[in-house]
């Protein structure tokens, strides 16, 4: 695994768990609001973490940690992801995956083999706005739709989440996304933070006020029973 970053202990990234967070490099999207530009655009310039150091840490922390979060970048691009997760599971640790959902084949394999306990999938926009919000004019949004369907049909815990960027996503867009993921376990609206964005122009954009986000929650709740706001 090409590991590029590491938060050794987190109480907030994996609901209900004390976890370590591992960051992979590389991504197939170019989302303008992304805060991990180095991992997305220049992963080769970020030094690899020694994998043996991670395994030694997990062994030492046995009984204290109970989860591992694999995030990015986009973890499903890593060819060693599945065997890596198998090794984590062999340590009796729970696994949370953060993903953009563009590799439904990898997600299906992880779900089918019971290798993940929680998936947080970013749903960037309504289907018609996906090319704009991901920076990919030729994006195949059906692949994202397949991942949405896989999670809705699974028996693990999961959430869909959207970073709400003013000028790019409005109330009607959030309602359309909620309709797209209708019946999901959980949908989270994430507050946009105008810092270190992949597109520096967005650093001049003020986030939505909290009351605006909660109005979006109200509208999304028509389609998803549990809707939350994060980051306000």
Regions found by a protein language model. Name each.
Residues 1-18:
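Short, charged low-complexity linear segments at domain edges
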Residues 14-49:
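Canonical Radical SAM [4Fe-4S] cluster-binding loop centered on the CxxxCxxC motif
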Residues 6, 190-192, 229-232:
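Conserved beta-strand termini and adjacent loop/short-helix elements that scaffold enzyme active sites
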Residues 212-232:
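A C-terminal junction/extension of Radical SAM enzymes
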Residues 37-68:
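Conserved alpha-helical substructure of the radical SAM core
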Residues 3-6, 52, 98-100:
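Short gly/ser/thr-rich secondary-structure transition/capping motifs
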Residues 55-67, 76-216:
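Conserved AdoMet/S-adenosylmethionine-binding subsite of the radical SAM
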Residues 23, 35, 71-73, 161:
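A secondary-structure boundary/capping signal
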């Amino acid at each position: 695994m090409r590991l590029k970053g590491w938060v050794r202990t987190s109480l907030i990234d994996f609901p209900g768990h004390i976890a370590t967070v591992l960051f992979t490099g590389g991504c197939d999207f170019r989302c303008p609001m992304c805060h991990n530009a180095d991992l997305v655009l220049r992963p080769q310039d970020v030094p690899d973490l020694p994998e043996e150091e991670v395994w030694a840490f997990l062994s030492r922390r046995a009984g204290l940690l109970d989860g591992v979060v694999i995030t990015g970048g986009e973890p499903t691009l890593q060819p060693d992801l599945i065997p890596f997760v198998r090794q984590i599971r062999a340590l009796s640790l729970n696994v949370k995956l953060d993903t953009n959902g563009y590799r439904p084949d990898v997600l299906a394999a992880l779900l089918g083999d019971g290798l993940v306990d929680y998936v947080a999938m970013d749903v960037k926009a309504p289907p018609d706005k996906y090319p704009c919000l991901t920076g990919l004019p030729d994006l195949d949004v059906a692949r994202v739709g397949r991942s949405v369907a896989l999670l809705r049909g699974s028996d693990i815990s999961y959430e869909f989440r959207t970073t709400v960027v003013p000028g790019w996503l409005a109330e009607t867009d959030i309602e359309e996304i909620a309709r797209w993921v209708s019946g999901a376990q959980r949908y989270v609206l994430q507050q946009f933070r105008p810092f270190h964005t992949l597109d520096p122009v967005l650093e001049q954009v003020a986030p939505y006020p909290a009351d605006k986000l909660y109005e979006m929650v109200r509208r999304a709740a028509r389609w998803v029973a549990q809707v939350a706001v994060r980051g306000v």
